[in-house]
Amino acid sequence: MTGQARFTHMQDGTQEDWAVIAADFSAYARQLPARILTHLKLLEGDFGGFPVDRLTHSLQTASRAWRDGRDEEYVICALLHDIGDTLGSYNHPDIAAAILKPFVSAENLWMVEKHGIFQGYYFFHYLGMDRHLREQFREHPQYLATIEFCAKYDAAAFDPDYESLPLSFFEPMMERVFAQPRQSIYKAATAQNQTA
């Protein structure tokens, strides 16, 4: 089906209009991994004062997780944990979490969403902030896992001499992780449209 819907206000939409939109959505959704990778590449050359640029940091974080035997979903969370830096200077973990939310486990999502607070353990005190801010989550089931993510992968990923895997290595993983949402208000409609 090709074409465009004809309404100028959604209240005037018809079944035919929404069939056109749904068909287009499926094709568009399949390109999500490519769009995410394009956005991730915006981090290249952006050092923000750090020893490596933000793309290198992301690749290093994911490479360390992969080489440590983490599963693909975890590795993609590691790759994308700072993708929000470009649009969410004050809440970058929330941006990454919003992208990942339909596709990853609640455990990995929480880790990505909270990593900024947990990472603060290493530097908040230099900025006049409370480095122990993560303690508010001490009773959360993902508390130790998020400490581990930051300590082993995120905080350690600023080494200019580390041999990171290339972005192309992670592309097939991206395709698999983003192939089908686990949770979304559109999940049932998307699945129905793909089988039609």
Regions found by a protein language model. Give the residues of each.
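Metal-dependent phosphohydrolase cores
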Residues: 1-79, 83-196
